C-alpha cells in the first residue's frame, strides 16, 4: 500500500482570499487541500508528508474526550507553529480577562455605541473588554468585548489561547484569513474562530464594529431540539467551514497571542497562515442568522427565550449552560389575548444584549445598533413604559410581523462583571432606569 497516494479528488477545491470556498455542516469531519494530493492517504503523520510539508495536530479537546465530543484537526503546513521568536508581554489595558477591578452591579446598565477609533486601528487594537466572568484558568465563563476598527491587519497575526471567539459584526464586513481557510463575514452573519487558530482580519469596507464573546469553556455546540423534532432553530447544513487556503509569505511580522488574560507578541519571519491541507472537525465556521428557523407560539403567550437559542456552551450541570447565544430575529407574532413583546423578567442567569440592526421589540428607544445592555442575575428588566402601553392595547386578533431587526444575547450562568472601562465609559447611559419609571399603577381591587 502506498501511504503517500493522493487523497480523494473531492478534497481539492481551489480557494483564494477573493473567492472563498466553503464546506457545509456543523462539526463535520472535513478534508480539504489547496494543492492536489497534499493530504496524506491513510495516515496522519507520514515519515515524509507531500510537498515537503510538516504534519501538525491541533487539539481542541482532551485526547480522551468521548468521540462524539472530540475535536481536533491535522494540519499540513509549510513550517510548524513552533517557528517564531520568544513572546514578550504587551503593556495594554483594553483587551484582557480581569473582571474584578470594579464591583459587579445589580443596576440595569446600558451603553451607547463605541466612538470611532483613531486612524490606523486594526481589529486587535480595536478590541475593548466590556464584561465577563470565569476565566481561562478554570476554563469556564466568558469575556465580552466590543470592537471598532478602521485598518486591516497586514503584518500582524493573532491567536487566542484562552478561548474560542464568537464574532458578531454590527457594521462593516470582515475578511477572516485563518490557518484553515478564509471566511467572509458581514453583519447578520456570525463567525467562530476556535481556540488557538491563528488569523488576521481585513476590512473590505474600510471600517467595522461589532461584538465578541470569548468562550473560556466547553466548545460551542448546537442545542438539542427535544420535542421540536429533527429540524429547526439553526440547522447544521447552514454552517460553513472554509476550504484550505494558504499564503507562502516571508517578512518581519508580528504574532500576537492572548494567553492567561494578557496579550503577548513575538516576531515571526513568515506568515503562519501556511496550512496547505487539513482534515478534522476543529475549524472556523460562519453562519447566516437570517437562516435561523424561528419557533414561536401560534396560540397564546410569549414562550421562554430559549426558543431563540443558536449556540450553547454546556456546563457541568445538565440543563444549565455556561453560555447561550440567543437571537431575536424578524418573526411573526400571532398570540391572541396575550402580551406579545418579551415579558417582565428576573433571571437566575445574567444577560448581555447587543443590537445589530433595527429596533428591539421590548425597547421603543435608547437601545440602538452597536449599543449594549446588561441585566445581571435577578435584576428586574423588561419592556419600557411606551412598549408596555402600546402592547397592552394592541389588536391581538391580527398577526403582526416584527421586521428589519436583529438583537442578540450572551446569557451566562455566572454573574457578568463589567470592567472598569465599561463602568466608567462615557457611553454608559446614566438614566437608563428612567425607561421604566413611567409604568403606571393600574391596580384596582374593585375591578377585575
Swiss-Prot record:
Q: Which InterPro entries match?
A: HgmA_C, HgmA_N, Homogentis_dOase, Homogentis_dOase_bac, RmlC-like_jellyroll, RmlC_Cupin_sf
GO biological process terms on file = L-phenylalanine catabolic process; tyrosine catabolic process
Q: Tell me which cofactor or cofactors this protein depends on.
A: Fe cation
Give the residues annotated as active site. Answer: 302 (proton acceptor)
Q: Which GO terms describe its molecular function?
A: homogentisate 1,2-dioxygenase activity; iron ion binding
Q: Name the enzyme's class.
A: oxidoreductase
Catalysed reaction equations from the record: homogentisate + O2 = 4-maleylacetoacetate + H(+)
Task: Share what the entry says about its subunit structure, partners included.
Answer: Hexamer; dimer of trimers.
Q: What is this protein called?
A: Homogentisate 1,2-dioxygenase
